Curated annotation (Swiss-Prot):
GO terms for biological process: translation. This is Large ribosomal subunit protein bL19. It comes from Ureaplasma parvum serovar 3 (strain ATCC 700970). Keywords: Ribonucleoprotein, Ribosomal protein. InterPro entries: Ribosomal_bL19 (IPR001857), Ribosomal_bL19_CS (IPR018257), Ribosomal_bL19_sf (IPR038657), Translation_prot_SH3-like_sf (IPR008991). Disulfide bonds: none annotated.
Length: 123
């Protein structure tokens, strides 16, 4: 007979909350951000910047992810980042955009002027 009942969910929440970053800026889909990502190649490591529009921010806690899309040489490039990963050094918000959806997948079919997003003046 067990004297104490162990709640595994509470233990997992406690462990996850200790590993969360506190310097994450407030951003949503449609915003333009720069993600400073640490890349390890052999014994060397460097920081690579990835600037683009946030297509989706999803999840909560330590499993929160963001999909960022940019257009490089006329080709669309998307990359998914775990926000609280130790490989993500810093996230900067460049512009705040106004969109009406949480997941703006329709941006994948657009390029040029049709891919513009209305800018918000947030401070």
């Amino acid at each position: 007979m067990a004297l104490f009942k162990i709640n595994k969910g509470e233990i997992m929440n406690f462990v996850n909350s200790t590993q969360l970053k506190t310097d994450i800026p407030n951003f949503d889909s449609g915003d333009t951000i720069i993600v400073h990502n640490r890349i390890v190649e052999g014994k060397k490591s460097r920081i690579q910047k990835f600037e683009g529009v946030v297509l989706r921010r999803r999840g909560s806690g330590s499993s929160e992810t963001v999909i960022v899309r940019k257009e490089s040489s006329g080709i669309g490039v998307e990359q998914s980042f775990n926000i609280h990963s130790p490989l993500v050094e810093k996230i900067e918000v460049i512009k705040y955009g106004k969109v009406r959806r949480a997941y703006i997948s329709y941006m994948r079919n657009r390029s040029g002027k049709s891919a513009r997003i209305k800018e918000l003046n947030k401070q």
